Amino acid sequence: MTKVLYITAHPHDDTQSYSMAVGKAFIETYKQVHPDHEVIHLDLYKEYIPEIDVDVFSGWGKLRSGKSFEELSDEEKAKVGRMNELCEQFISADKYVFVTPMWNFSFPPVLKAYIDAVAVAGKTFKYTEQGPVGLLTDKKALHIQARGGFYSEGPAAEMEMGHRYLSVIMQFFGVPSFEGLFVEGHAAVPEKAEEIKANAIARAKDLAHTF
């Protein structure tokens, strides 16, 4: 069975967020088109997503030195264990849908913490004599991102770092197909905000048939 990991990184729901509204339209249509696929919603603002900190480094160091997982402290086990769970869940999925806003030219920090949890050598990529090689070569990914301004082209395109970062990390993981669906300009042209949102929702529903 095809497994889709629907990853949202926004504190608001679809009634307050443009990206979440478009994401909801996409995933609901996707479920209708693919009723036999398993869709798992991972809300990064509601789930426990550990950050790499002193406990994580300490736990990793102990494991590398040959100690067992049970020999870690309670804090180390909780954090390292959860990161392992997130990584295994990520690897087990066939498709990824990331839904984020653009905040200060990037995305919310909780998504970076999540990426740090799943970027594991030997799991999502490996090191070789020729350099790192991605291991997720049979996956595909989509990024739905809301941007208040216009960043798809022109000088401002160089300032957008959220989608570009995800593109780089997906390539690093070996994911061969990575698409972007952008809702942009609603803050720059507020009188057209509803039209911009409606057009993005329509595109999302269309994309759900082919993703």
From Swiss-Prot:
Listed cofactors: FMN
Keyword line: Flavoprotein, FMN, NAD, Oxidoreductase
GO molecular function: electron transfer activity; FMN binding; oxidoreductase activity, acting on NAD(P)H as acceptor; oxidoreductase activity, acting on NAD(P)H, quinone or similar compound as acceptor
Broad enzyme group: oxidoreductase
Enzyme Commission no: 1.6.5.-, 1.7.1.17
Reactions listed under catalytic activity: 2 a quinone + NADH + H(+) = 2 a 1,4-benzosemiquinone + NAD(+); N,N-dimethyl-1,4-phenylenediamine + anthranilate + 2 NAD(+) = 2-(4-dimethylaminophenyl)diazenylbenzoate + 2 NADH + 2 H(+)
Binding site for FMN: 17-19, 102-105
Superkingdom of source: Bacteria
One Pfam family here: Flavodoxin_2
Keyword Oxidoreductase: yes
InterPro entries reported for this sequence: Flavodoxin_fold (IPR003680), Flavoprotein-like_sf (IPR029039), FMN-dep_NADH:Q_OxRdtase_AzoR1 (IPR050104), NADH:quinone_OxRdtase_FMN_depd (IPR023048)
UniProt remark on cofactor binding: Binds 1 FMN per subunit.
Subunit architecture: Homodimer.
Family: Belongs to the azoreductase type 1 family.
Cited NCBIfam families: PRK13556.1
Role noted for this protein: Quinone reductase that provides resistance to thiol-specific stress caused by electrophilic quinones.
UniProt protein name: FMN-dependent NADH:quinone oxidoreductase
